Curated annotation (Swiss-Prot):
Belongs to the UPF0502 family. Signal peptide: none annotated. It comes from the Bacteria. PANTHER family: UPF0502 PROTEIN YCEH. Transmembrane segments: none annotated. This is UPF0502 protein Gmet_0262. Pfam families: DUF480 (PF04337).
């Protein structure tokens, strides 16, 4: 894919899609609800321990890339939702399979059918295979079939939103160049924001000092 997401963005996006389908009554999600969803112990691989700041950074990046947006429904608290359906013209069955791949990584057809049940029931394995076929045969594929692992009968499928997955057993000495550049850009952006906050705090402190001096002239 042209746009590559990092692991935190993948988890945030997957949780937004999952919660829309599994618990629509609580969707869109507040920051607290989204962070809790990202750090769930169940239905997650790997289990993560993200802070609110991590989720906010991921949301900002996803919004800039057109994968998520702030919901107008968030009156008292800011709420967030995904844009996958509009961005890629996906139907609920597509979203259910993709969400499962986003939050749990590569899986077999059987695993996807069982685990996606909480979001969208599939009549049989053929129904899941059809969704996977459509996601793979798009002009811009969203899913790929992985090579069969030694000793395993079934092949697994993986999403492509984080780029092409590494071959099984392959150890990467360094992250892909695209991901490395994204992380560097994100770190630089955060550093700039921190510098701006520091400068603003200094200005506020100086204004307070000047105000105190001004008041003291009339006491």
């Amino acid at each position: 894919m042209e746009t590559v997401l990092n692991s935190c963005e993948i988890r945030v996006l997957g949780c937004l899609v999952e919660k829309e389908l599994a618990t629509p009554e609580y969707y869109p999600l507040t920051l607290n609800a989204l962070t809790a969803a990202c750090n769930q112990k169940s239905n997650r691989d790997p289990v993560m321990a993200l802070e609110d700041a991590d989720v906010v950074r991921a949301l900002d990046s996803l919004r800039m890339k057109g994968f998520a947006r702030q919901s107008a429904e968030g009156v008292r608290a800011m709420k967030y939702c995904h844009c996958l359906a509009e961005k890629f013209l996906l139907e609920p069955p597509d979203l259910a399979v993709l969400a499962e791949l986003l939050v749990r990584g590569p899986q077999t057809v059987g695993e996807l059918r069982t685990r996606a049940e909480r979001m969208r029931p599939f009549a049989d394995l053929a129904a899941v295979e059809e969704v996977l076929r459509m996601l793979m045969e798009r002009e811009e594929p969203l899913v790929t079939r992985l090579p069969r692992q030694p000793g395993r009968k079934e092949q697994r499928y993986a999403h492509l939103l984080a780029g092409a997955p590494e071959a099984e057993g392959e150890e990467s000495m360094a992250p892909p160049e695209g991901a490395r550049l994204q992380v560097r850009a994100e770190n630089e952006r955060v550093a700039r924001l921190e510098e701006e906050v520091t400068a603003l705090r200094a200005e506020v402190a100086e204004l307070r000092r000047m105000m105190e001096e001004f008041r003291s002239q009339f006491e």
